[in-house]
Amino acid sequence: MDPNGKIALVTGAGRRVGRALALALGDAGCRVAVHYGQSGQDANETAALIQSMGSEAITIKADFEDPRQVESLAKSVHDQLGPIEILINNASIFDKINLANISVDNWDRHLAINLRAPFLLAQAMQAQLGDDSHGKIISLNDWRTSRPTRFAYGVTKTALSGLTRTLALSMAPNVQANEISLGAILPPSDIPVDRSRDEIKIDLGPADRMGSLNEVADAMMMLLQNDFITGETINVDGGRHIQ
């Protein structure tokens, strides 16, 4: 797929990884819908940066705990820009809570935001595209989902991998669905990064460094431009997943 002129929706695009991906899409000539939940000012800044590149950008607020707002988000993108051709599932939550302490409400919140919203958006995307159009779905995941201290996050991110593979089959051959599994990624330049290795408290893996937002964006662009990769996980983690 040539991303130029395509309509892209990036969820959670106000800051960090989501902003970097939205900016990369704008730089490639996409017309970008910048979704946000609470970070309205950040989302507006993201959209303004895209517009400064000469690409179209809009912002849309939606609370992913409410399925009606997810459906409204998809409709708003269609009404303002056209059918969603590129869906980037970046929005997620990762509350630090273990099995013994998790509540039903917290469990349901993780399911709604991390899993149900990507499903509903893919369903809406398929309906908007019709039978003859092509599209891409890329979901952001984590190289390590089995974290007892982040129980609901781990379960929903594991399920997101299953959703990605199932979408790759269900939406074939016109839509390719893949995921990017992240390791330790550098924060934006306005957040201090001069932390010692002891402060970071993570094993950086074979690469022995943190990744950059540009490297995540590069992986996304590769998946967008390659129509023969689907149902796949691209690990952008410095090799951490093989240790």
Task: Tell what function each PLM region has.
Residues 98-99, 106-111, 190, 197-201:
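Substrate-binding pocket helix/loop in short-chain dehydrogenase/reductase
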Residues 14-16:
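Conserved glycine-rich cofactor-binding loop
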